[in-house]
Regions:
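A conserved catalytic-core segment of Leloir-type glycosyltransferases
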Residues: 7-9, 35, 44-113, 286, ...
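Donor nucleotide-sugar binding/catalytic pocket of nucleotide-sugar-dependent glycosyltransferases
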Residues: 152, 165-220
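Conserved donor-binding/catalytic core segment of Leloir-type glycosyltransferases
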Residues: 222-223, 227-244, 250-253, 263-264
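Nucleotide-activated donor-binding/catalytic signature segment of Leloir-type glycosyltransferases, i.e.
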Residues: 260, 274-316, 363
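Short hydrophobic beta-strand element within catalytic cores of glycosyltransferases
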Residues: 346-350, 366
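A charged, aromatic-enriched C-terminal amphipathic alpha-helix characteristic of glycosyltransferases
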Residues: 386-420
Length: 426
């Protein structure tokens, strides 16, 4: 890690493809911005899709990975081993457009430090990564590369016609960038593959806040979902994509047999198409499991639907849940796990690699699966449902461990250290 010239840093610009909704990058960015605000910094945003304050945001549509031109390039650049000259031309046309607007963002908002959220980690928007890299290289601007996951962790990015661009920008080797990763395995891989040192800052949660309980607004959620008295609500707080392992949660519910359980998948996003959604819907039907995924009752915030009914947010779902399922095959860290322990809900979790290395050793009490559901997993879940004292002891212990190891206070300490690497003390 390198020291840049000493300078006053007061205005921080977050840069990513989107800052909207409840995906891990958007949620973690909000936490960083909150803590940096408490530390006295002003935060601004550059992205292609946003729900941040408009007066602090520069919105450039081509920065979003779902923009038609960007999505078309993705199809042409991966799953192949070479690219046409026309593709190169389109990449550089978009790169130049984005680069110009990034310079405008830095000037208009008088940015002192860039925090690049995953846009230099995973190539969802290749021109954008190139543009960010060139701006930092040309200005020597202090930057933090906050990496949530890397392209070498995803099968679909391993064959490409853009290896030269991946080497250049995902992530780049530039003296003014301090790299931050969210787990110890990512730190090791970044060192081995790129020769870059990095700081580990795990995902965090505001354990000093008060969790939302069942209130006058959300007490109707169960009835609106068609649940009866004595039914159990299992919450899978993830997107509908294959690595989230929703089929394991379906199997778990099926094996509980005698209990009436509704399995609710909270997120609407299907970033990797609809094939997996169709698969889990058919699987749930085959096993006669009551699955709700992509419900119009759920949104990013409370509100009213087209016909005047209530829209519930993720926190309403947590407040009403009896158990949280988290059977992911892979996670960069595990935001949903922290949310579940904050809301003091029992958790069934798969021992994905980062959980095994960075979270499990802390001593959380959960129902575990290791790649697949076992009789022991089912037995442990049954005990959580049937034994209130066991459930209370586990959830209270988990909350205290979360507060100790994954709090905003820890985030502030780590951010101060990273910012000091730019020669800034304070």
């Amino acid at each position: 890690m390198y020291l840049t010239r000493t300078r006053d840093i007061r205005r921080i610009g977050f840069v990513s493809t989107r800052f909207k909704g409840t995906d891990g990058v958007s949620l973690e960015t909000e936490k960083w911005a909150t803590v940096l605000g408490r530390m006295g910094y002003e935060c601004y945003y550059y992205c292609g899709l946003s729900d941040r304050p408009a007066e602090r945001t520069m919105l450039v549509e081509e920065a979003y990975f779902g923009h038609p031109d960007v999505a078309a390039l993705q199809t042409l650049c991966f799953g192949v081993t070479e690219r046409d000259e026309e593709i190169t031309g389109e990449i550089h046309y978009l790169r130049q457009l984005l680069k110009k607007s990034l310079y405008g963002f830095i000037v208009d908002f008088r940015i002192d430090l860039l925090v690049v959220e995953n846009a230099l980690s995973i190539p969802m928007n290749i021109p954008f990564g190139l543009a960010i890299t060139e701006v930092i290289a040309e200005t020597g601007m202090p930057a933090i590369g906050h990496h949530h996951d890397f392209f070498w962790e995803r099968q679909r990015f391993l064959m490409s016609g853009v290896d030269d661009y991946l080497d250049m920008a995902f992530p780049p080797r530039l003296h003014s960038i301090n790299h931050v990763v969210i787990n110890t395995e990512a730190r090791a891989q970044l060192g081995r593959r790129r020769g870059l040192s990095s700081t580990v800052i795990p995902n965090v949660y505001d354990f000093a806040a008060r969790p939302r309980g069942v209130d006058e607004y959300n007490r109707t959620l169960r009835a609106d979902l068609g649940m009866g008295e004595g039914d159990f609500l299992f919450l899978q707080p993830t997107r509908v994509i294959a690595r989230k392992g929703i089929e394991h949660a379906i199997e778990l519910v099926s094996r509980l047999g005698e209990r009436r359980v509704k399995l609710l998948v909270s997120h609407q996003e299907r970033d990797e198409g609809t094939d997996y959604y169709r698969r889990i819907a058919e699987y749930a039907g085959f096993l006669k499991v009551d699955l709700v995924a992509g419900s119009p009752l759920l949104g990013t915030s409370r509100g009213s639907g087209p016909e005047g009914g209530k829209i519930y947010d993720l926190w309403d779902c947590y407040a009403n849940a009896d158990l949280v399922t988290y059977p992911s095959a892979y996670e960069g860290f595990g935001n949903a796990f922290l949310e579940a322990i904050f809301y003091k809900k029992p958790v069934m979790v798969n021992r994905y690699s980062i959980f095994e290395s960075d979270i499990e050793p802390i001593g959380f009490k959960t129902a575990l699966m290791d790649t697949y559901i076992t009789d022991e997993t089912v037995r442990h879940v049954r005990r959580f449902l049937d034994e209130p004292e066991l459930r209370r002891e586990a959830t209270e212990r988990n909350f205290e461990l979360g507060r100790k190891y994954f709090s905003y206070e820890l985030l502030e300490q780590r951010l101060r250290t990273v910012i000091m690497n730019f020669g800034v003390v304070g």
